[in-house]
Amino acid sequence: MSIASNSTVIILGSTGSIGTQGLDVISRHPERFTVTGLAAGGAHIELLAQQAAQFHVSEVAVFDETKVPALQAALAQAGAQGVRVTGGPDSVIAMAGSGANVVLNGITGSIGLEPSIAALKAGSQLALANKESVVAGGHLLFSAQVRENQINPVDSEHSAIWQSLRSGTHAEVAKLVVTASGGPFRGWKRADMENITPEQALHHPTWNMGPVVTINSSTLMNKGLEVIEASRLFNVPPERIDVTVHPQSIVHSMVEFVDGATICQASPPDMRLPIALGLSAPDRMTNVAAACDWTQAATWTFEPLDDEAFPAVQLARHCLAASEKHTAVLNAANEQAVHAFLEHRLPYLGIVDTVKAVLDQMDAELRGNPLFTDVEEMNQLELEARRRADDLINKQ
């Protein structure tokens, strides 16, 4: 779908990494976009109020309902007038489903699924950076579409694949190749990782992201989730999706075609590029991000993934082959384990070990009916996965 020349936009997760960069892109093209609503968790109330004032939005929603009074005060302080303020998860879902031309979903975690579904059902084009929507509830998400091609992927890897797929038909695709920077511990062996601290893991060599995504990038669980997302978004089986380590993070992913040609998308690492395309596709905008400087000598390297040191990708592949419920448990248990690690309650190697243990516990009960019937069923399964992860973490 071609986005209207002056599109209404709602930003979910506006104070996070995706949201702030999305607003930066929009600020450079005021003639193309009008931001009508912002939603955020509630951890950065002053920033949310400043965004509302800068973009003259009509509505702001906050997940944490207790932050509504503080947000109202911050809006007054920022000089934002006539802004409707709502609170609680239902208010964010309602905003997402209000019928904007584009909804940019930069929420972290599976709580982003219901807003994604609401946006699709309302006919909005969904610029999707919330990979958990696809990982935990892909069937529910895709069945909510009211037309074809309603989802614009915003993850840099999936945006790269999306762009590269324009070079051929689906039948001509031999494989997808997802690139990984390797994270801060590239080249480390498993034995070297026992004493990794949150502070070390939060230092990513390439990308500036939120804490959960940064930890996922260090364990390469993020890459595992991206393999799941790529398979479901582009209808390619997992055995035809490779992962290669590319430390320079210039080639963001590739598509290999049946004739031997490989098409890639290359650019210096800057999330504003895939965000901008997610907002404006199929059109491209000027003044978004820097291009590669082809006048300078450069070396791009690619190396195989060390599955022994980073078992998360293989674990994700196993879940993808098993069922949607397995991938939902993978995601929920991982979120719980990452939070425990960030709070110094779980050692670094315990993150993926905990996820695997939860999956082992729940495997038999997940195999009966592989698809969720509704979001409530998914939420209940995730709660059980989180509970089991907590039990294992508390025994550490």
UniProtKB/Swiss-Prot annotation:
Cofactor(s) listed in the protein's UniProt record: Mg(2+); Mn(2+)
Residues where NADPH binds: 15-18, 41, 130, 132, 210
Per UniProt, which keywords does this protein have? Isoprene biosynthesis, Manganese, Metal-binding, NADP, Oxidoreductase
Catalytic activity line of the entry: 2-C-methyl-D-erythritol 4-phosphate + NADP(+) = 1-deoxy-D-xylulose 5-phosphate + NADPH + H(+)
Amino acids binding Mn(2+): 155, 157, 226
Q: What class of enzyme is it?
A: oxidoreductase
The pathway noted for it is:
Isoprenoid biosynthesis; isopentenyl diphosphate biosynthesis via DXP pathway; isopentenyl diphosphate from 1-deoxy-D-xylulose 5-phosphate: step 1/6
Q: What is its EC number?
A: 1.1.1.267
Which Pfam families does this UniProt record tie to the protein? DXP_redisom_C, DXP_reductoisom, DXPR_C
Keyword Repeat applies: no
| Single GO biological process annotation from the record | isopentenyl diphosphate biosynthetic process, methylerythritol 4-phosphate pathway involved in terpenoid biosynthetic process
KW Manganese (keyword) present: yes
GO terms for MF: 1-deoxy-D-xylulose-5-phosphate reductoisomerase activity; manganese ion binding; NADPH binding
User: Which residues hold 1-deoxy-D-xylulose 5-phosphate?
Assistant: 131, 156-157, 181, 204, 217, 222-223, 226
Q: Which InterPro entries match?
A: DXP_reductoisomerase, DXP_reductoisomerase_C, DXP_reductoisomerase_N, DXPR_C, DXPR_C_sf, NAD(P)-bd_dom_sf
User: Which HAMAP family does the UniProt record give?
Assistant: DXP_reductoisom (MF_00183)
The record's NCBIfam families line, in alphabetical order, gives: Dxr
- Described purpose of this protein according to its UniProt entry: Catalyzes the NADPH-dependent rearrangement and reduction of 1-deoxy-D-xylulose-5-phosphate (DXP) to 2-C-methyl-D-erythritol 4-phosphate (MEP).
Protein family: Belongs to the DXR family.
Protein name, as recorded: 1-deoxy-D-xylulose 5-phosphate reductoisomerase
Lineage, broadest ranks? Bacteria, Bacillati, Actinomycetota, Actinomycetes, Bifidobacteriales
